[in-house]
Amino acid sequence: MRKIVINGGLPLQGEITISGAKNSVVALIPAIILADDVVTLDCVPDISDVASLVEIMELMGATVKRYDDVLEIDPRGVQNIPMPYGKINSLRASYYFYGSLLGRFGEATVGLPGGCDLGPRPIDLHLKAFEAMGATASYEGDNMKLSAKDTGLHGASIYMDTVSVGATINTMIAAVKANGRTIIENAAREPEIIDVATLLNNMGAHIRGAGTNIIIIDGVERLHGTRHQVIPDRIEAGTYISLAAAVGKGIRINNVLYEHLEGFIAKLEEMGVRMTVSEDSIFVEEQSNLKAINIKTAPYPGFATDLQQPLTPLLLRANGRGTIVDTIYEKRVNHVFELAKMDADISTTNGHILYTGGRDLRGTSVKATDLRAGAALVIAGLMAEGKTEITNIEFILRGYSDIIEKLRNLGADIRLVED
C-alpha cells in the first residue's frame, strides 16, 4: 500500500502549470467512440482515471497511443462488448459509455458507476433522457443494460429535474447521432460541457447553446476524426491557488482561465487573499491577516463543490469563525474528521461544516476518503509542523497529475512511499 509522506512547515515558491481538465477528459475519451476516424487529444492529464479509461477503450478494440500529454485514439475497431461492474467500478465517469455506446451501437451493457463516495449521485436523470430518446433501461445486478436497437435513438425535448453536469454531457453524447432534434432544458453550464460540445462539433456534430441552460442538438449520420485541446483543469487550478495562499512565498499558477474561476476567486478576495491575475496565469503573494468567511457551494458559475475541500485548510489559517455548506454533495464532509486529527478546530453537524481559524496544525497520520479530501490533506500536511502521512492515496492520484513532482518543484518535502 502506498502513502504520501510530507514534512510540513516549509515556505513554497515557484511556478506550477495546470494540466488538462479531469472532468472534461473523462467524458471526451468515451465520446470518441462515436467517431469513424482517429481523434487526437492534447493536454491530457497523467492521472489514473485516464489510464483506466484507456485500458477500457483498448479492451473494446480501440487503438490508443500516448506520448507526453497527447492521446491518439482510433475507435474504428471498437466492439460493443459488455463492460461488467468489476472492470469499471472505480470510475464515476464510466456512465459516459452509456451515451457513446447507445449512440454508436444502439445498445450498451455497462457496470454501474463507482468513484468517490459523496452521497447520492443517482443516474436517474441519465436514464430519463435516454428513455425519452427511445431507449429502454433495465438493471442486471450491478450492471445497466440499455437498448434502442429496434427503433434507434430519436430526438426529444428533455427537461433536467435538477442541474446535472454528468446527465447534460451524457445526453449530448447520445443525441449527436440520434434522428432529429434534441433539446435539453435546465442544462448544466460548466466549462467542461462546453469542452465536450466543442470536441463533438469539431467531429461534425451540430450542438448549439452549450454553456447556457438550453442546449439544442441536431443529429447527424456520422462523426469524423479531429484534434482537440483539453481545457485547463479549473479544480486543479483552484487547489493550487488555495495551496499558494496557505503556504506560499510567491507562487505563479500557469495555464489558468480566470473566467472559469471567477466565483472561487471572489471568495478568496473576500478573505483578503492578495493575487495578480494576468491573461493565462495567476500570481499568489505571501498572505497575512486573512479573514474567515462562509462558503456555500452551487452549480456553475457559483462556488464549485469540488473546491470546498481544497479551500478548507486555507480557511483554517484565517482569523475568526465560518461555515461551509455543500448543497451539491451532502456527504462531502469526511475531510473534517481527518483535519480534526491534525488539531484543526473544525466540526460538522447536519451537513454544515463549522470552523474556527488561527490554530496551528500538527502532522499526524490521516486517510484520504475521496479525491478532493485527499487534496485538502496534502495542503494541510504542507501547512502543519512535523510529519504527515496520508494513506488511501489512490484517490488523489485519480485526479491530480504529477502532484508529487509539481510540489517538489516548489520546495515541498513530499514523497511517495511504498508501505
UniProtKB/Swiss-Prot annotation:
SUPFAM superfamilies: EPT/RTPC-like. It catalyses: phosphoenolpyruvate + UDP-N-acetyl-alpha-D-glucosamine = UDP-N-acetyl-3-O-(1-carboxyvinyl)-alpha-D-glucosamine + phosphate. UDP-N-acetyl-alpha-D-glucosamine binds at residues 92, 121-125, 306, 328. Its main location: cytoplasm. Phosphoenolpyruvate binds at residues 22-23. The active site is at residue 116. Pathway: Cell wall biogenesis; peptidoglycan biosynthesis. It is found in: Cytoplasm. InterPro entries: Enolpyruvate_Tfrase_dom (IPR001986), Enolpyruvate_Tfrase_sf (IPR036968), MurA_subfamily (IPR050068), RNA3'P_cycl/enolpyr_Trfase_a/b (IPR013792), UDP_GlcNAc_COvinyl_MurA (IPR005750). Pfam families: EPSP_synthase. The modification 2-(S-cysteinyl)pyruvic acid O-phosphothioketal is found at residue 116. Gene3D superfamilies: Enolpyruvate transferase domain. One of its GO terms (molecular function) is UDP-N-acetylglucosamine 1-carboxyvinyltransferase activity. Its EC number is 2.5.1.7. The keyword Membrane does not apply. Keywords: Cell cycle, Cell division, Cell shape, Cell wall biogenesis/degradation, Cytoplasm, Peptidoglycan synthesis, Pyruvate, Transferase. PANTHER family: UDP-N-ACETYLGLUCOSAMINE 1-CARBOXYVINYLTRANSFERASE, UDP-N-ACETYLGLUCOSAMINE 1-CARBOXYVINYLTRANSFERASE 2. This strain of S.pneumoniae has no heteroresistance to fosfomycin unlike other strains of this bacterium in which MurA1 is required for heteroresistance along with other as yet unknown factor(s). Heteroresistance is the ability of a clonal population to grow one or several subpopulations at a frequency of 10(-7) to 10(-3) in the presence of a higher antibiotic concentration than that predicted to be effective by measurement of the minimum inhibitory concentration (MIC). Cell wall formation. Adds enolpyruvyl to UDP-N-acetylglucosamine. Target for the antibiotic fosfomycin. Belongs to the EPSP synthase family. MurA subfamily. This is UDP-N-acetylglucosamine 1-carboxyvinyltransferase. It comes from Streptococcus pneumoniae (strain Hungary19A-6).
